[in-house]
């Protein structure tokens, strides 16, 4: 019994861990805009798997088309919210918009919306950015542990 135990300990102690190999960053292949058009009901914003926050732009909120509150073809951002449902086909969560504004707004009910250019919009897993035209602001959203 002692010999078996000694042999087992010798074998265990002589084992070396496998060499660490370089890990490839597969997030470079992710296109977070997939599903943001044609009723895919997904959003490109920043989120972490199983995280409590899914921060993303809102480009509309009326009707079934805007279940995720983002449609790729839109040219106006209404604001940014902290919770989104992805691919559900229904709206929920009662989001509160956050939007940078400057100056006095004559019509507060819609004056907070801003145009943005698709060539100045980008997203990767955990990161979203867009440059707003009015006010001239670069919005950046991130998610991390």
Regions found by a protein language model. Give the residues of each.
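Bacterial Sec-dependent signal peptides at the C-terminal "C-region" and cleavage site
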Residues: 11-23
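Bacterial N-terminal signal peptides
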Residues: 2-10
């Amino acid at each position: 019994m002692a010999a078996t135990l000694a042999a087992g300990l010798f074998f265990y102690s002589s084992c070396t861990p496998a060499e660490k190999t370089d890990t490839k960053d597969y997030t470079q292949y992710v296109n977070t805009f997939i599903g943001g058009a044609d009723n895919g009901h997904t959003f490109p914003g920043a989120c972490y798997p199983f995280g409590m926050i899914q921060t993303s732009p809102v480009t509309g909120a009326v009707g079934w088309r805007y279940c995720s509150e983002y449609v790729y073809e839109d040219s106006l951002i209404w604001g940014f919210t902290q919770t989104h449902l992805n691919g559900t086909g229904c709206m929920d969560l009662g989001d509160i918009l956050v939007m940078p504004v400057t100056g006095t707004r004559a019509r507060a009910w819609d004056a907070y919306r801003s145009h943005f250019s698709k060539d100045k919009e980008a997203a990767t897993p955990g990161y979203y950015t867009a440059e707003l035209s009015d006010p001239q602001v670069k919005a950046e959203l991130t998610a991390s542990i």
